[in-house]
A protein has these predicted regions:
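Conserved N-terminal phosphate-binding loop of PLP-dependent enzymes in the Aspartate aminotransferase
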Residues: 1-228
Length: 228
């Protein structure tokens, strides 16, 4: 409704709508889109002649190899990828529909690393391996195993530890902790014991994380939560 109102009050002035595939910011529970949300946005952008652009820099390849728009059942006009595309090498990509090619080709822009072959080779190899492994499904499963274990351990010790967002890119917080200090102590003690976690940011699951790593993480969390 808010987007409809903006289009109505700025008719013919909005060139594009750009958004993350779901709300995965910091210091707040992540929020998935309601059923039908993106389909309505897609329809509205099409009717108003505005491009629909997805910022998939963080969530890209963690939900679907075809892009997060595919995961949520709609088609973006442009998608921005980075980070996971080459396993840490400096590569980013802007993917779009064919009808935009002529427009893009008319824009002059330069870059410093276009002839850097190693990142492109890394990107190709990484994408091929992700496809072979059906990686998003594995990452989501690993993330769910981890978050289920952590929340169960917390519940045992009287803490409401909440995991939100997609399990491959989850956000974690102790809900019954009004001043955030308990959560920060929890994370600090986890790091002290060799488990690198972050206070108020998303946790990015990777393929190298094994079931044994997850079990050890949950065991350490159980110990820390008992001592808090």
């Amino acid at each position: 409704e808010g987007l409809e109102a903006l289009f109505h009050s700025h008719k013919g002035e909005i060139a594009a709508v750009i958004s993350q595939p779901y709300m995965h910011g910091n210091f707040a529970d992540n929020r998935l889109p309601a059923d039908g949300f993106w389909q309505k946005v897609r329809k509205l952008c099409t009717e108003q002649g505005a491009l629909l652009i997805v910022d998939d820099v963080r969530a890209g390849f963690r939900l679907s190899l075809a892009g997060s728009d595919s995961y949520f059942g709609f088609e973006a006009d442009l998608i921005c990828f980075c980070k996971a595309i080459a396993n840490g090498y400096n590569v980013s990509a802007l993917c779009g529909k064919d009808f935009l090619k002529n427009t893009v080709s008319g824009i002059s822009f330069t870059g410093s690393y276009w002839l850097s072959a190693v990142p492109f080779a890394a990107g190709i190899a990484c994408l091929e391996k992700m496809k072979k492994l059906s990686l998003p499904d594995l990452l989501i499963a690993k993330g769910k195993r981890l978050t289920d274990g952590l929340t169960a351990a917390a519940q045992k010790h009287g803490y409401d530890l909440r995991a939100s967002g997609v399990p491959s890119l989850f956000y974690l917080r102790i809900a019954n902790d009004d001043n955030l200090l308990t959560h920060q102590r929890f994370i600090s003690e986890m790091v002290r014991r060799g488990v690198y976690m972050t206070n108020h940011h998303n946790h990015f699951i990777n393929y190298a994380l094994s079931d044994a790593d997850i079990d050890e993480t949950v065991e350490i969390a159980d110990e820390v939560l008992r001592l808090l």
